[in-house]
Structure formats: C-alpha cells, structure tokens
C-alpha cells in the first residue's frame, strides 16, 4: 500500500508492507524507492516495512526551498506518527537514507532501535566530489538527464562489476533520473549533497546498535573509512560487500538481507 503523507519537506510517498516490528527504509539520492525492490520482499517477511520516497524523487513532492537532513529526519517522525507507530524502529538507509538515519537516531533516539547505513559517507563532500557534483548539476540544468549525465551518475552509484553484469540495475538508475522532476532533483542534490555537513561528531552520540555497510568499490566511503567510523560508535560495527559501490541493496541484495538479519539477530533480543 502506498499513500501520500504531508510533512515539513512536502508530501511524501510512503509504501507499507508486511507485519511485525517497524523497519524504515530511505533510499539514496538520484534513485527512488524502487532501489529497495530486491530486498523489500525478504525484509517484509519479518518486519512491517515502511519505505519512504524522499523529496524530489519518485512521486514525492519538492518543498520548493532548500531543506536539511534534520528536516528529513523530522519528516520521518511525522510519517511514523501518521502511521500510528509508537515503538522504536529499525532504520535502514542507503547513502542519503543513512545520513538521515544518523540524524534521526541522535535527535530522536527513543524512536530508533537499530541503525543500518548502506554506502553512507559520514564526512562532507571533498573538493573533487563537490566540483563533480556542481558540474553535473549545471549540465543537468541545461540539458536534462541526457546520456553522459546518466552515465556519470551510474558510474558513481554502481560498481564496474555491477554495470557489466547487471543491465537491470543500470536501467533502473537511468529511469529514476529520467522520471525525477528536474528542478526538484537538483534541489535535493544541492540541499542534501552540496550542503551536507560532516556527521562525524554525531557518531559518539549514537546510543543504538549501528552497522556501517559499504561496498568494496565505493570510492567515496572506503572500507577503511567505514571501519574508522564504526569505532566511534559505542555499539558500532562494520561490514564490506565485495563488488558493490553506493547502491548496496540494489547491487548485492542477498548479501544485504543476510547482513541485516544477522545484525538484527545480534542486536535485538526478541528478534525476529
């Protein structure tokens, strides 16, 4: 079931599946909720899965102004209130969704039971990443999601191995870029990517069991960086998925669901 829920960052599309304790899924920038398609069925066998489509993506609105990770985290709280969820949730976030999860788990700690971040760099963009993003935004403004822009984004989000063996994943990323409203997508990238703060200082304040997952081919969030981040979290741990980059749940769904289940089993006494 998918419904639109009004939040401080616009009306957001929210899909609910399954029964049991609530797990919240929030996707990466540039793709929409379909990027969870390969893991959602499995997770919904033991959780009530609430999949949020972020502003400027899919069917969700754009608020018409810049917005922050904290506002996205507050929007998640609004969604949970609207759905009548009052127990702590298991948060799973891919890139952007992981950033929001870190903020949610520190700003609204009683509402979060566990946190899984997938391909989520904790630091702000470096100069090279910022310059590349500014160029892509300028080109997108002039030309829209033309071939070289789709290729540029795909080459960052998906590993070389995924691009070679998985044309469906490549097509999904491209389709998400084509379907997204142009101005709304750019607003999301500026708000969340270019304006993203360094979240390192929040890590020691994470009081919930936290798993940092990254792909072996993720240039912006290396295994070494993910391990270092996990050591700053009181109940932090780290895992690396071979042959993946940013979009771990799309690139390696079986490994993703296995990691999440094992993490929940170790972290939640009453699992599943």
Task: Locate predicted features.
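Conserved HGGG/HGGXW glycine-rich cap/lid loop of the alpha/beta-hydrolase fold
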Residues: 10-65
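Active-site loop/oxyanion-hole signature of alpha/beta-hydrolase fold enzymes
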Residues: 41, 50-92, 258
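Gly/Ala-rich beta-loop-alpha elbow adjacent to hydrolase catalytic centers
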Residues: 93, 97, 101
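Flexible "cap/lid" loop of the alpha/beta hydrolase fold
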Residues: 106-107, 112-143
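Conserved alpha/beta-hydrolase catalytic His-Asp/Glu region
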Residues: 126-130, 146-204
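Short beta-strand/loop motif that positions the catalytic acidic residue
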Residues: 206, 212-214
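Conserved alpha/beta-hydrolase "acid-adjacent" motif
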Residues: 219-225
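Catalytic active-site module of serine/aspartate enzymes centered on a nucleophile-bearing elbow/loop
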Residues: 235-272
């Amino acid at each position: 079931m998918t419904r639109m829920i009004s939040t401080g960052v616009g009306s957001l599309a929210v899909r609910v599946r399954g029964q049991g304790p609530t797990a919240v899924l929030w996707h990466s920038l540039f793709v929409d909720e379909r990027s969870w398609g390969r893991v959602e069925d499995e997770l919904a066998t033991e959780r009530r899965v609430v999949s949020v489509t972020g502003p400027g993506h899919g069917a969700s609105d754009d608020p018409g102004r810049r917005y922050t990770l904290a506002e996205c985290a507050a929007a998640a709280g609004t969604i949970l209130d609207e759905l009548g969820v009052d127990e702590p949730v298991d948060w799973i976030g891919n890139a952007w969704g992981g950033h929001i999860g870190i903020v949610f788990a520190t700003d609204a700690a009683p509402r979060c039971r566990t946190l899984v971040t997938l391909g989520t760099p904790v630091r702000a963009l470096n100069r090279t990443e910022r310059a590349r993003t500014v160029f892509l935004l300028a080109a997108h403004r002039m030309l829209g999601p033309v071939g070289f822009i789709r290729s540029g984004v795909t080459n960052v989000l998906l590993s070389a191995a995924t691009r070679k063996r998985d044309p469906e994943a490549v097509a999904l990323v491209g389709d998400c870029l084509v379907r997204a409203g142009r101005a709304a997508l750019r607003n999301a990238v500026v708000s969340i990517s270019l304006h993203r703060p360094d979240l390192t200082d929040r890590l020691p304040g994470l009081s919930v069991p936290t798993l940092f997952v990254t792909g072996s081919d993720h240039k912006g969030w290396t295994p070494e960086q993910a391990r270092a981040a996990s050591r700053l979290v009181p109940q932090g741990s780290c895992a690396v998925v071979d042959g993946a980059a940013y979009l771990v749940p799309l690139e390696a769904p079986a490994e993703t669901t296995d990691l999440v289940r094992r993490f929940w089993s170790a972290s939640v006494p009453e699992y599943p």
